[in-house]
């Protein structure tokens, strides 16, 4: 009954026909997606009968100085499969990625947390504001250049 | 199922958030240095010349044996405080088994755990709402100095930045025995204290 982690290359192959050029890299259990194609990739991953990722475990982000990486962990309850989706976002001033709250409501607070601590904007989020820190706090504390 | 953006979600208004942020920034700006500990009682020494029980002694005895603590668990120290209140350590031996959920019915505040700046205005407001005489016990490393989080952007480096502290109980977290030692020290302090002197007036927080 364990969950099976899908291989990145396998998912990339399945996505290549519907969305050519969307997946830029594929790892052992992850795919890296172009930020412009994220919304459509996520819709396919949730809705197509091949994947049916109906549960979003978490949204998080990492700061690699040259770029930010937003990481989504997906699980399909029906197919007992998991996948990690990553998006690279460049630019420290105004990094932006599309929100996935319209697909998974659970992304709401987690995207707010990423926005609060990393300063990544989620386009289309219904209520993007700080969640843990207070209004007026200067900076985004989980960034590598904070302090 | 209605579309996501049609759902009515319990979002607070932006104005309330900005107001809260201003309050916190204001409190941080005003809390650069610790509030001095109430220690006027230390210079007094034992009262001499009167053999009969003074009013102060009677009051001190009554107060120290009927402390009602405020229900205030912030982090993992709260579990040790709950254990202290439970039947194994049994805080009712000290006449203080009634943890009050209202500051207006409490005599002392056990600040059990890490205090963040976002929580700090609430702590200060609850302290202000407690009736005199009132005492504060800082429980654990975080409440004393911020502990391992003392350099954090989000943690108050010691609750004595926000409210005056009478007794510090070190430990991470302190065991119930440690908390009891602190409480017994507080009992002695209350008995020595002059009931009419040594009140500290803090500026109002609005």
State each model region's role.
Chain A
Residues 1-147:
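Terminal low-complexity/charged segments
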């Amino acid at each position: 009954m364990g969950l099976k982690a899908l291989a990145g290359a396998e998912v990339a192959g399945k996505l290549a026909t519907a969305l050519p050029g969307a997946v830029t890299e594929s790892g052992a259990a992850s795919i890296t997606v172009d930020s412009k194609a994220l919304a459509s990739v996520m819709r396919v991953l949730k809705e197509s009968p091949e994947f049916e990722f109906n549960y979003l475990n978490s949204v998080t982000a990492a700061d690699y100085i040259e770029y930010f990486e937003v990481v989504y962990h997906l699980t399909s309850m029906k197919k007992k499969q998991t996948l990690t989706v990553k998006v690279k976002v460049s630019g420290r001033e105004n990094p932006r990625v599309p929100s996935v709250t319209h697909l998974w409501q659970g992304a709401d607070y987690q995207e707010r947390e990423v926005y609060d601590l990393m300063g990544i904007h989620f386009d289309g989020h219904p209520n993007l504001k700080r969640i843990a820190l207070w209004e007026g706090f200067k900076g985004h504390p989980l960034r590598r250049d904070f302090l | 199922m209605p579309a996501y953006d049609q759902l009515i979600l319990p979002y607070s208004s932006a104005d309330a958030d900005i107001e809260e942020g201003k309050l916190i920034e204001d409190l941080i700006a005003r809390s650069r240095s610790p509030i001095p500990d109430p220690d006027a009682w230390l210079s007094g020494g034992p009262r001499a010349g009167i053999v009969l029980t003074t009013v102060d002694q009677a009051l001190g005895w009554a107060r120290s044996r009927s402390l009602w603590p405020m229900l205030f668990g912030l982090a993992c120290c709260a579990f040790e405080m709950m254990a202290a209140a439970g039947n194994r350590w049994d805080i009712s031996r000290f006449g203080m088994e009634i943890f009050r959920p209202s500051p207006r019915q409490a005599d002392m505040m056990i600040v059990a755990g890490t205090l963040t700046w976002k929580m700090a205005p609430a702590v200060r407001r609850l302290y202000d709402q407690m009736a005199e005489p009132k005492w504060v016990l800082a429980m654990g490393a975080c409440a004393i100095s911020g502990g391992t989080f003392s350099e954090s952007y989000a943690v108050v480096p010691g609750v004595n930045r926000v409210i005056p502290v009478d007794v510090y109980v070190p430990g991470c977290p302190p065991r119930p025995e440690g908390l009891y030692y602190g409480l017994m020290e507080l009992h002695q302090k209350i008995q020595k204290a002059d009931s009419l002197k040594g009140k500290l007036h803090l500026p109002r927080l609005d």
